[in-house]
């Protein structure tokens, strides 16, 4: 099974004719999502990737029948109106993709959703993907990538970071651990389905046997999970990694919802609460796959499958010459470079064949430091690759990768 969406979910796309709406509709359809209709006022009668477009949600429901879910790809100031329209037409699950939706708008959406029994994910979310069934949003970037990176298995994944959502799932799969559903809860201060609500949904899913999550400083989502475990409402094994260990009080970390205020929402406090509740918390992001495998094994859960190794690739090398006891990297003597240049300078040299200027070297160093706590993210790497293949400079490719985090 899965949570929230599956291959039978009838999906409506609000804002389907916009740039994001068109691109993400293609991803959703190619992955297998049952996208039934789209809505953009004034665009009725047009077709986007085979999906009929209507002027309103009510019109789409009248022509195509009841909808189960709506993916909202419209500017933040219009999100409230779109969400209220969707709920008025009987839609019971909404994915609110845009960030910076006004807080009071989100509060109103929350109130109406509670009254009508509607769930919504976001705002500021990458989306949700039920492996080999359906995707809403933009997880994976393309259907081809999503099908390659994410394989079925017994682990549910939820995260407060969009990039980490994909990264955790990708790295787990490299260890042979597949997923049921992958979800990014959203990065804003007020969201519809925080981590604690997602964990409760996974608890009720018979095919999800364990949960892996990425938490952050700020708010109380992680502490509320600890309380759920202590109350006996959550019993499945949970493995967690929390970002923001070095953040100081009063500073925002990564997302609008990640801010430490005094002693509230600190990294230390969250880790302590989770560990006291029995959650396995790892302190190094790269340890997640192995630790998850160990936790599953201790619970008697067989979660691993054979990982297919790619064959036949030919890898280029930056080594330009080999002599007895000496290797040349891009024409430079490697032993003379060691201890004299930084890691970022070495990367630039290997990729470009020349040493970076002082300005570019410092820029790359800053980018690497800023990325350490979040780890490498496949979507960011894909963005950098796409820009690089156009012939753009290495600096431009790096910038594209960072901007996609």
Feature locations, PLM:
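Catalytic-core regions of core metabolic enzymes
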Residues: 1-308
